[in-house]
């Protein structure tokens, strides 16, 4: 895939406000402050497309970005931030459960993990949630540039040991762009309908 153009379209706070399902969606999920906005900006080559914040838990909406006029990237609220109120967590939980559980347009979920702290309890819970809803997902290990070669290898081993249903695991640096080509190739694979199914031996790749 080559991204020619990208534009922010809308923020959604309720399921009834979702766009129609004629356009496929790739969903970006992960813990608060894992680097979703930085990843989206890196993938699209648009530095300010997704607003980055140093405040965990700031993204509270489903943010839609139109890619090449025929695909949505959807940035969903981060999880695992303790300072958020129970009321807000409950509201986010209902929104995400309804969206991930019922949205037919979702082609793939990209689950971002901090490569320095991969597979935390909340990450494993999200993997179980996606598997329960039979959603194909791949793993992106963010902030790869902060690790040594030995630490990178360990992060991949730890992730692979618990992400048994993941279709792929890609190490990514939003600073250098490492992993961008591989990740976009995986997107092409899913959008073309060539995926062989979550968790199959032929589908899981580590790069």
UniProtKB/Swiss-Prot annotation:
NCBIfam families (alphabetical): GTPase_YsxC (TIGR03598)
The protein's required cofactor(s) are namely: Mg(2+)
Q: Which family does it belong to?
A: Belongs to the TRAFAC class TrmE-Era-EngA-EngB-Septin-like GTPase superfamily. EngB GTPase family.
Mind listing the UniProt keywords for this protein, alphabetically? Cell cycle, Cell division, GTP-binding, Magnesium, Metal-binding, Nucleotide-binding, Septation
What the protein does comes down to: Necessary for normal cell division and for the maintenance of normal septation.
The source organism is: Chlorobium luteolum (strain DSM 273 / BCRC 81028 / 2530)
What GO terms fall under cellular component here?
A: cytosol
Binding residue positions for GTP: 30-37, 57-61, 75-78, 142-145, 172-174
What this protein is called in its record is: Probable GTP-binding protein EngB
InterPro entries for the chain:
G_ENGB_dom, GTP-bd, GTP-bd_ribosome_bio_YsxC, P-loop_NTPase
* CDD domains from the UniProt entry: YihA_EngB
């Amino acid at each position: 895939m080559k991204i020619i153009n990208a534009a922010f379209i809308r923020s959604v706070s309720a399921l009834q406000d979702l766009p129609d399902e004629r356009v496929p969606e790739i969903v970006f999920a992960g813990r608060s402050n894992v680097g979703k906005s930085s990843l989206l900006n890196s993938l699209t080559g648009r530095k300010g497309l997704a607003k980055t914040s140093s405040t965990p838990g700031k993204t509270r909406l489903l943010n839609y970005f139109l890619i090449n006029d025929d695909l949505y990237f959807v940035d969903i609220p981060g999880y695992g931030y303790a300072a958020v109120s129970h009321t807000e967590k409950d509201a986010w939980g209902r929104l995400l459960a309804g969206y991930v559980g019922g949205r037919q347009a979702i082609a793939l979920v990209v689950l971002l993990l901090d490569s320095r702290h991969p597979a935390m309890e909340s990450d494993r819970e999200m993997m179980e949630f996606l598997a329960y809803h039979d959603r194909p997902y791949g793993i992106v290990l963010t902030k790869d540039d902060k690790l040594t070669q030995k630490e990178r290898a360990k992060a991949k081993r730890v992730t692979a040991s618990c992400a048994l249903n993941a279709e792929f695991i890609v190490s990514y640096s939003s600073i250098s762009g490492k992993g961008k080509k591989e990740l976009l190739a995986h997107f092409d694979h899913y959008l073309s309908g060539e995926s062989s199914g979550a968790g199959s031996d032929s589908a899981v790749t580590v790069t």
